């Protein structure tokens, strides 16, 4: 009987993959045979998840990265390509929400941090990875948005705006890159512990 998801020979780069949704995605993709790149800001959790995947029989590398910093993102892609030679799957999962409360009370600095990390970081990473996928004949991009991007919220409104921007980015990239055999989707999960 064949496996439903066989990712043998595929390389998956997953941001924010040391806990929660990102970690679960990395573990499942590794179990399906993908070579996975574990990434988040802090090196130690990256290493721990990477080693756990290897102990379970998977193949993984750890590349710490702050997705709000363009140089970090370029390095993440460069190290992935150096290790595995290609990127078949990109999961943009990393995000930040340092402030809770009404958008009207948000400082410019907090707005910039949320938008730079969540929306601009995803934009930068996709623009770096998509041409690499095109060189290899195609690929898949999954942008983890949020239900907060689909409805207003007085507590996490700016986070929601950033996630709505990610969903819109996914729609645009799907139109631009779909004819080149690159599928781009956005998923909008609800609250996760």
Task: List PLM regions with ranges.
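Conserved glycine-rich Rossmann-like NAD(P)H-binding loop of the short-chain dehydrogenase/reductase
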Residues: 34-49
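Alpha-helical segment proximal to the catalytic Tyr-Lys
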Residues: 131, 175-179
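Active-site helix of classical SDR
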Residues: 126, 162-165, 170
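Active-site loop-to-helix junction immediately N-terminal to the catalytic Tyr of the SDR YXXXK motif
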Residues: 2, 106, 152-160, 172
């Amino acid at each position: 009987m064949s496996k439903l998801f066989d990712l043998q020979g595929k390389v998956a780069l997953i941001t924010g993959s040391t806990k929660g949704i990102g970690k679960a995605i990395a573990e499942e993709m590794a179990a399906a045979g993908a070579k996975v790149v574990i990434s988040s800001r802090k090196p130690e959790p990256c290493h721990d998840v990477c080693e756990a995947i290897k102990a379970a029989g998977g193949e993984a590398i750890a590349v710490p990265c702050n997705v709000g910093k363009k140089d970090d993102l370029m390095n993440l892609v460069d190290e992935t390509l150096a290790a595995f030679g290609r990127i078949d799957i990109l999961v943009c999962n990393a995000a930040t929400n340092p402030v809770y409360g009404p958008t009207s009370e948000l400082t410019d600095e907090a707005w910039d941090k949320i938008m730079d990390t969540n929306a601009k970081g995803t934009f930068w990473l996709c623009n770096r990875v998509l041409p690499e996928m095109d060189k290899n004949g195609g690929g898949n991009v999954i942008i983890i948005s949020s239900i907060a991007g689909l409805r207003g919220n007085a507590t996490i409104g700016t986070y929601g705006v950033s996630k709505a921007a990610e969903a819109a980015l996914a729609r645009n990239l799907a139109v631009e890159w779909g004819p080149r055999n690159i599928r781009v989707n956005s998923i909008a999960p609800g609250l996760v512990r």
